[in-house]
Amino acid sequence: MALPYHIFLFTVLLPSFTLTAPPPCRCMTSSSPYQEFLWRMHHPGNIDAPSYRSFSKGTPTFTAHTHMPRNCYNSATLCMHGNTHYWTGKMINPSCPGGLGVTVCWTYFTHTGMSDGGGVQDEAREKHVKEVISQLTQVHSTSSPYKGLDLSKLHETLRTHTRLVSLFNTTLTGLHEVSAQNPTNCWMCLPLAFRPYVSIPVPEQWNNFSTEINTTSVLVGPLVSNLEITHTSNLTCVKFSNTTNTTNSQCIRWVTPPTQVVCLPSGIFFVCGTSAYRCLNGSSESMCFLSFLVPPMTIYTEQDLYNYVVSKPRNKRVPILPFVMAAGVLGALGTGIGGITTSTQFYYKLSQELNGDMERVADSLVTLQDQLNSIAAVVLQNRRALDLLTAERGGTCLFLGEECCYYVNQSGIVTEKVKEIRDRIQRRAEELRNIGPWGLFSQWMPWILPFLGPLAAIILLLLFGPCIFNLLVNFVSSRIEAVKLQMEPKMQSKTKIYHRPLDWPASPRSDVNDIKGTPPEEISTAQPLLRPNSAGSS
């Protein structure tokens, strides 16, 4: 998990410390290695740099680490540099930063998403997260669900900063210059939750590096992780003392830093693996190259965003901003062809805007992701609470789910547009709150009417169908009985019934079942009946 992306993160309230100010931090280094590294970057063909003493002595620079494992120190105390609190302690392990017995400084919080193993950085973060959750649990929902939650405390935390306005204006200018789509009126949204930064490697032909160190603080360690790397060819790679493979086909240019801690100019970062660094200590286990960093953004048209907020969410979204420009920009950066000046300058300026936020990482006390998780776990009771937050509170940012959106046109950010859509959302919410039973029925009538006819037919069929079926069955049965009665006399007229006495002797030549025999009635009338008694008396 990496750092969230916009400056909302860096405007959170600082923790409350005791009234007694901590002592000043004493972790200073010289800027000479930085100047030597700049010389090597401008003279990549020269193996031997001028004598180290020929460089200016440099100004003392405060150095702090972004991560310090718990097993590197026995105890840590607070110190202060530039109105910012740091931890300081003596190293007890030779493999720790600085080495055995060296006193070093590290940031109040560790690199986001990492743990120091139960040390002072973890304790500080846990303490602040509890404070944030305690504040959020005091926020409660009132009246109708469409009003959502009173997240005024969160909104104060996420107030717009001038750096964000500058970041958007820079992005919009570059988008107009290098994008084929060239959007003129749209909503540009920055994520509140985690989404990877995008790494744009510095092209070989570009040498517009700053020649002066412009920071009084050096943060040694990763500033952001889980980068989205656009391409891995034609890279400007860094050769350290322990680098063995200098024939990597991905690298088209090599630069060699000194062994001391070295920092890059504002807007340029070391990318080692999937992590970005501002400063390195002269060694790295993985291959490192120079890169710009740009924030991820989502772009909506006016209608798409209104449909998303007012009606129902839609899954269709345009690509993240850097990939909107991919066809015209990344191809040029990758092949090294001409026409890259405009796009490279854009990415450099955008990366510088981002760098201003990176340097404030030590001032941020908790990531916005932690706050969002706290809201979801404690008080976020309906999905549309953040969507409707701007209908209840002021601000120039329109909260859309887990994104913060700004309306932009050719002139830059238009804050009035946020108020306009906020009013539309508020009117829509009022309509939903004030709607009565008959009003709700009238709203559903256009959807119900097409189904009323078939539905009524089905109901009538279920009610009267059995009766109609029984009537049909009875009618058919009566007709069948009538036909049977008409056919019965004709059948009887064609049938003869024969009778004979029970003691009539069976004739060997005649039988009652023999159709060729003589019927008993006809025999009795044709000849006298012979009886056995009369024959014996004669």
UniProtKB/Swiss-Prot annotation:
Region (Essential for the fusiogenic function): 465-484
Extracellular side: 21-443
Region (Immunosuppression): 380-396
Chain positions of site Cleavage: 317-318
Region of interest (Fusion peptide), residue spans: 320-340
Cystine pairs: 186-189, 186-405, 397-404
Motif CXXC positions after renumbering to this chain: 186-189
Pfam families: TLV_coat
Alphabetically ordered keywords of this record: Cell membrane, Cleavage on pair of basic residues, Disulfide bond, ERV, Glycoprotein, Membrane, Signal, Transmembrane, Transmembrane helix, Transposable element, Viral envelope protein, Virion
Alphabetical list of CDD domains matching this protein: HTLV-1-like_HR1-HR2 (cd09851)
One Gene Ontology cellular component annotation held by this UniProt entry: plasma membrane
Family that this chain belongs to: Belongs to the gamma type-C retroviral envelope protein family. HERV class-I W env subfamily.
Recorded domain comment: The cytoplasmic region is essential for the fusiogenic function.
Subunit-level organization: The mature envelope protein (Env) consists of a trimer of SU-TM heterodimers attached probably by a labile interchain disulfide bond. Interacts with the C-type lectin CD209/DC-SIGN.
Role summary: This endogenous retroviral envelope protein has retained its original fusogenic properties and participates in trophoblast fusion and the formation of a syncytium during placenta morphogenesis. May recognize and induce fusion through binding of SLC1A4 and SLC1A5.
Name of the protein described by the UniProt record: Syncytin-1
